[in-house]
């Protein structure tokens, strides 16, 4: 209505500014192509797609795994653990302040979307950027077509109705085509770049997960699992946003601001350009400074979020302990305290965001009002047309879109970089337990020919001799565990390691597995220093039943198969029978497909230990360790199970090392090594240590346990005697009552 009532004062100033590239003035003024920015819909779709497909590690350690309904067969080869995905120019290990900087993270991230020797990725990135440029070219023409439509409507076409219809129709079609083309190119760009972005997220998450698996045990003992999984989760989401922001936000914003400033300067003079420049400068300075001030609130919220996740994970993992000690309210209060810190930080984030948005809107609205006033003055004086006024309005509003995104993108970019900070810190953690370059595999003596030597008493030809030479080690420099310890575990024999608590028994297992490196000395297996062989070959040849059986939240079948991933179902059922799990499994409704629960909490401790033994037997390792492996079993089951395992080990000539507190379980060992205060104080067989050294530490431990057992048996005998006496008393009372009843009945009959 407004346009119809406008009367042109001077027809001569009417100028048709043709869209690119049809008119020289415009084609000269606009030399940078840009793309229409994300609409709210496309932005949310892209972000949600990125977020939903991000890899979450938390599911690996904290979430409930999905049950598997069908067992694997031998026809499927075991999945091979791939090494971390490498770009040829990966960053060096180690953490430093420069590596943890934002520039380092962005540089590392760029390598994931532009990897060397990956032409497919590069082609996709180039196509996506080309579509970005094409969409920007179409998008910038939309306000020019709209201006020409308005100016055309203000010309008297009374005598040229046909020409008017043709011109207006062409401009309207061009307007609609340019707008639709810009949106279409933007969506195509999103679709093509999506695989690049998601692949980059997968690469970073995978490399981080593999890095965590390769970290030493001390690292994991000093970290909380909830914080690690939350760092990976937030970091992958941050990568998704940073990639979309850098490729589709920062570059288009820069192009769009440059184009609009150039158009205003060329067509409408320096005053409009100066106003635009001052607005951009004030807007950017305000946004950057305010966002830098708000960053500390986001960091506080992240720390509180990690703390809440750790409390929740600890409470759920130790669910039984919480219930046993009736401490639900205590755990809930701890969780609520962490949530309160997160709430306080989140409120600060929200209020500071409101301040930031208000300031940004004030700056932009002030600039828009001033520019509209200048444009109306130009229309009034006849220097500008109504179409020019509309063009200025649309260009400034078109500038408002990237300006609004500039604020939100900068805020989200800073937040995403904070979220990525912990993720990249994990990637740059130094690995303490390393192999030497080109480390050879561990090769055992006579490894392939040990089944035909039943009459050979020379154990040197058997595989699996372990020798400690002057080994010293401590978890902390001020608390040594092993002090110049030297001993030999002969190949093919059953050897027991005993001693008081804290003497270093379980530490020996960790050192043989190279979970830690020793401070001095050497550990040899068949004469080979374990620090100079590959970790994979070392751990492949060693099996263990630990004190606390680690089980996955999976089926019984898959937990046993974990000992050897290529094992067939028949082999698994055979070891199930050997460890006497078949009766239990037969009584379960789902059999071997029964889910054992988080950390195996749905089965008993003894059943978990037998499952761990089945896993060990399936692995068929030539060197085996038992760390209090039967502590949760009753005496009858323990003896039957140990008899079966001894038979298997004897047939296969396996080196068997047992760590035990209950000395009766290792009395038949070929050799017993006694530790005390980190040193080997005694060695020998059970009878040698008792008879030849009656005052030995082993003899003292044995006598203490035997006396306790005797006292226990006597107590049991006393209890049984008391029960028998009570029973006799009850029987006597019952007989007396029956006699009285009989006499009374007889008297009544008489």
Swiss-Prot record:
GO biological process: intracellular iron ion homeostasis; transmembrane transport
Organism: Candida albicans (strain SC5314 / ATCC MYA-2876) (Yeast)
Protein name per Swiss-Prot or TrEMBL: Iron-sulfur clusters transporter ATM1, mitochondrial
UniProt keyword list: ATP-binding, Membrane, Mitochondrion, Mitochondrion inner membrane, Nucleotide-binding, Transit peptide, Translocase, Transmembrane, Transmembrane helix, Transport
GO cellular component labels: mitochondrial inner membrane
Binding-site residues for glutathione, renumbered to this chain: 294-298, 357-360, 407
Gene3D superfamilies xrefs: ABC transporter type 1, transmembrane domain, P-loop containing nucleotide triphosphate hydrolases
Record-linked CDD domains: ABC_6TM_ATM1_ABCB7 (cd18582)
Keyword flag Transmembrane helix: yes
Membrane-protein topology: Multi-pass membrane protein
